[in-house]
Amino acid sequence: FDFYALPSDFFGRDQVSANMLIQSKYDTVCHELGRYVLNKLGQSVARRFIPYVQMYEFEGLLFSSPEKFAQGIDRLDIVHKLKDVRNQFETPEHINNSQHTAPSKRIKQLVKGYQKPLYGVIGALEIGLPTMRQECPIFNTWLNYLAQLPLLE
């Protein structure tokens, strides 16, 4: 799920305020989603359910390295503009602060004909998962959690 695209009645969304830290928003919504699954489906299902709500669009990850993203889509002419966006925020995870200034909207302003599946994948491959993990702490924490899970038989 992408936090800003969630309906207003999504689990815990009504408990989140604009001035909350992004980690607190994430914790609140994931907790309420997990609680809902537990109440509706029971412990046997809930213990296998790992709630995760991405606090930004996929394109937020592309701001992990503006240089690599621009290089990947062969648009080195926009590196400085991408860096300007990135430098306004603590992490790429903070960029998605409204539906009008979401990462994809910012990229579409710079890249005419931006195709999310094509350019997004090319950019992500150029950036690499290690850089995304380093720049996006909530995403990294979730991946670390998944990596530590025992295999189910």
Positions of the model-derived regions?
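C-terminal accessory helical subdomains adjacent to catalytic cores in phosphodiester-
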Residues: 2-153
